[in-house]
Amino acid sequence: MTSINEQQVPVASPVIGEAEIDAVVQVLRSGNVVQGPEVAAFEERFAALVDGRICVAVNSGTSALHLLLLALGIGRGDEVVVPSFSFAASANAVRLTGADVVFADIEPDGFGLDPAAVEAAITPRTAAIMPVHLYGHPAAMDRLTPIAERRGLAVVEDACQAHTAALHGKPVGAFGAGGAFSFYPTKNMHAIEGGMVTTADPELARTVRLLRNQGMEQRYANEIVGANMRMTDVSAAVGRVQLGRLAAWTERRRANAAYLDDHITAPAVTVPPVAEGARHVYHQYTVRIRGDRDAAMARLTGAGIGNAVYYPTPIHRLKPYWEPDQKTGRAWDLPETDKAADEVVSLPVHPSLTEGDLERVVTAVNALGENP
């Protein structure tokens, strides 16, 4: 058990330092707190992370996905192939357009969409594939993109957890028709709240800009139906500060993950897989537990090690998706998704961890042995 003098090692540790506070105060004193010069500067700087693609800042990662799908013309009558092993926002963004979600299974040796399962899920109504770069590991874009190209489908990347992740040197958010990033406080970098759309298509970017601002480019000259999904200058100012620290934070995450990989030896625990050519940025360090996961988590918590399950219920088993499918008689056979949801546990990997913290994590995990 944790001693009275030991604090729990948290599974996540968002950073809001003096530089972020100073940046916010400067914006507040300027009087221009809504979308303005800070947002434009943040968009320009973020483009360097995605091979110079056009960036459009919005108010959340979910909005980024939603607006990107809308800008691509996806809506009622269309289908989008999505992994069920993800946060619900991936599927919610599709449903909000009026399109239908078609779930495909994940790979048995990873957490991303299985290209073979995607191929099998495609129908004449399929308009897009949405790979999710879950936990900071790139999906199999080298195999998914050719499927989309051959079938004439858009690729919409959910990169909300994967800032600076890459596959064979190409950054996520730069593969498909567009990508979506999140700046929620627990992400590898944050903007308090916010999101970013990335695309190489100027017309698509313009449509997203219209959609985020009530359909307007010029004030009161509405061109299309839109909404208020703008990022504020307050959020953008925080994002710009965090962006300057992202590289160092990411290398610390990767170093922490390497330490855990090298020192976790418990037979019941499988460390995160990394595909050949993949740059994993470890938004989460997610292991698989063989045996009684609840007992293992309780033991870790008792030892003062923060832990969490992302995500305990696959999307296809959540009420908004499960009940309609039961009414229509459609059933999803996603064995690898269900298996992962039963086995995964995320451990601390964030850049604020000390050497002592890492040693405590390893000691607690290895104490699980063969049978948690």
Question: Can you describe what each PLM-predicted range is?
Answer:
Residues 1-32, 37, 348:
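N-terminal "arm"/small-domain region of PLP-dependent enzymes with the aminotransferase-like
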Residues 32-79, 92-97, 103-105, 170:
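Phosphate-binding glycine-rich loop
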Residues 40-44, 52-56, 116, 128-132, ...:
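PLP-dependent aminotransferase class I/II
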Residues 56, 81, 102, 154-156, ...:
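Structural detector of well-ordered beta-strand residues that form the stable sheet scaffold
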Residues 70-134, 138-159, 166:
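PLP-dependent aminotransferase-like
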Residues 157-191, 218-223:
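Conserved active-site segment immediately N-terminal to the catalytic lysine
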Residues 181-182, 195-201, 240:
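Short beta-strand-to-turn element immediately C-terminal to the catalytic PLP-Schiff-base lysine
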